[in-house]
């Protein structure tokens, strides 16, 4: 009997902050399961979830507006600790009898708050001390409105010159509010505050660990599928690879992985996937060489969105054909992860996040009646990687830079041809190899090469040549929503350029992309 790793759980109500998923990841890092729901959940849904504590997230709206989001009243009647962050603190204050006003002094960025009263939330936590020995905390503010009067049964725990109620608390009811973001790294003691709330105040045990998650997933897979056969589309990416390893541990040879080689993968990637999963780990893999089919479908197409749709459609066709060849397959496995499925149960107000459906494999043939199994659907990407390590997958594979689903199909600009893909594969491999050799690979968030469908004149020896151009792209980012181009050393860029032009016959010029996001996107197409 496996341990119930969901026994202690935190409910996070999302009011629309860009940091809300980060709050959830921080709680998970503390070893505690949590779920992220839209703010307008019902009392029945909260009761059914039975949380050990509730966190109210930040959000972009103003509590002073008439129709702005409010926490369900039951949140404050459930008898569990509640932690309001930024907007979450403001709606807590307002709903419990305090007052919030739009502030003339908006606070964005670093601030130092002074702890003026004792509280279980921050007891013994400090970054510095005032001259008279009071604790100071370095925090990250991001708010326009501010609480101007706290509810009568709350006390002020910390303040700044412009924010008299930076932390408020009702210790008896275990309600806490902070006017800053403890989940971001700029709030230096933020993880300690979250740990104090989740582990001490809510009394949650650290049951959510990679080893226990694996045991739980294996038990649930076995319970769900029994002795049935399962099929999985294996791409070699992180999500499908970890899904494959979990299923293999749970059901062994009853798993069949279909690996479709679309001709749009990185250099030697198909061979590496087959060697690792087939030869090394002993998974049952059906290898489908389909380069000609994909390239023929892409012939003559220049539009990036049309190329994506073609690649997706052909993949589904090929996968379906292979699935039909297998006998008695009852289940389709997918590597769906938690950010793909975060949603609210039917939102009454329409203010909840739009549901994002995500399918690694598209529609299945009507004659195939299969159940769906998604072993990773509770996990964030960083958790998937940790589980992959625990399952024995190599670090370099799990922590590779992101690679787009359509592969080189969107890194060859314009029409996709085999010649272009082959040149791009070799140029990109040189760039990545040199990044690793210079210990720069893990210092940038993503790096890749783009093939430009333009020719440029070059000189080789005594002759001139008229060959293709590639662009190197490297960016630094925290969340991939915004990004800076990476300031790679000139001598490094020169070395990469020389190697590509000398070793890849057909490329005469290498350029470096110095566009940030925004205005540019990270990928060119």
Curated annotation (Swiss-Prot):
ATP binds at residues 235-241. Keywords: ATP-binding, Glutamine amidotransferase, GMP biosynthesis, Ligase, Nucleotide-binding, Purine biosynthesis. GO terms for molecular function: ATP binding; GMP synthase activity. Pathway: Purine metabolism; GMP biosynthesis; GMP from XMP (L-Gln route): step 1/1. Its EC number is 6.3.5.2. The keyword Nucleotide-binding applies. Residues 9-207 form the Glutamine amidotransferase type-1 domain. Catalyzes the synthesis of GMP from XMP. This is GMP synthase [glutamine-hydrolyzing]. It comes from Shigella boydii serotype 18 (strain CDC 3083-94 / BS512).
């Amino acid at each position: 009997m496996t341990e119930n790793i969901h026994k202690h759980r935190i409910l996070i109500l999302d009011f629309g902050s860009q940091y809300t998923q980060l709050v959830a990841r921080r709680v998970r890092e503390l070893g505690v399961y949590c779920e992220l729901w839209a703010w307008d959940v019902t009392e029945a849904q909260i009761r059914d979830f039975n949380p050990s504590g509730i966190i109210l997230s930040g959000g972009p709206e103003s509590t002073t507006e008439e129709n702005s989001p409010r926490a369900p009243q039951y949140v404050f009647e459930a008898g569990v600790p509640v932690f309001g962050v930024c907007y979450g603190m403001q709606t807590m204050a307002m709903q419990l009898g305090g007052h919030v006003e739009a502030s003339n002094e908006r606070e964005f960025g670093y601030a130092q708050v002074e702890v003026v009263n004792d509280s279980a939330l921050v007891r013994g936590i400090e970054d510095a001390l005032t001259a008279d020995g009071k604790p100071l905390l370095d925090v990250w503010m991001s708010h326009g409105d501010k609480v101007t009067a706290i509810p009568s049964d709350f006390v002020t725990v910390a303040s700044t010159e412009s924010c008299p109620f930076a932390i408020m608390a009702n210790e008896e009811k275990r309600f806490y509010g902070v006017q800053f973001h403890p989940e971001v790294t700029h709030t230096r003691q933020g993880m300690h505050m979250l740990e104090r709330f989740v582990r001490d105040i809510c009394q949650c045990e650290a049951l959510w660990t990679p080893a226990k998650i694996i045991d739980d997933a294996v038990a649930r897979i076995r319970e769900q599928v029994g002795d049935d056969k399962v099929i999985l589309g294996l791409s070699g990416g992180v999500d499908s690879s970890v899904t494959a390893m979990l299923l293999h541990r749970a059901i062994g040879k009853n798993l069949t992985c279909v690996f479709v080689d679309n001709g749009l993968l990185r250099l030697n990637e198909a061979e590496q996937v087959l060697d690792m999963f087939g030869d090394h780990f002993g998974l049952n893999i059906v290898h489908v060489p389909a380069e000609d089919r994909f390239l023929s479908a892409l012939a003559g197409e220049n539009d990036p969105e049309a190329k994506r749709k073609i690649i997706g459609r052909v993949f589904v066709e090929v996968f379906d054909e292979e699935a039909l060849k297998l006998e008695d397959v009852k289940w389709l496995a997918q590597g769906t992860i938690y950010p793909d499925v975060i949603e609210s149960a039917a939102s009454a107000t329409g203010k909840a996040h739009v549901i994002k459906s995500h399918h690694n494999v598209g529609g299945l043939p009507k004659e195939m009646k299969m159940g769906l199994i998604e072993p990773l659907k509770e996990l964030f990407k960083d958790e998937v990687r940790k589980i992959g390590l625990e399952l024995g997958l190599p670090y370099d594979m799990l922590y590779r830079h992101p690679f787009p689903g359509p592969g080189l199909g969107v890194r060859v600009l314009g029409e996709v041809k085999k010649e272009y893909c082959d040149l791009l594969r070799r140029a990109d491999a040189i760039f990545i190899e040199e990044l690793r050799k210079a210990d720069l690979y893990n210092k940038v968030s993503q790096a890749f090469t783009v093939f430009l469908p333009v020719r440029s004149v070059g000189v080789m020896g005594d002759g001139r040549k008229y060959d293709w151009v590639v662009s190197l792209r490297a960016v630094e980012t925290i969340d991939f929503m915004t990004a800076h181009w990476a300031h790679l050393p000139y001598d490094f860029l020169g070395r990469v350029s020389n190697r590509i032009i000398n070793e890849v016959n057909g490329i005469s010029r290498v350029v470096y992309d110095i566009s940030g996001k925004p205005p540019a996107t990270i990928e060119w197409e």
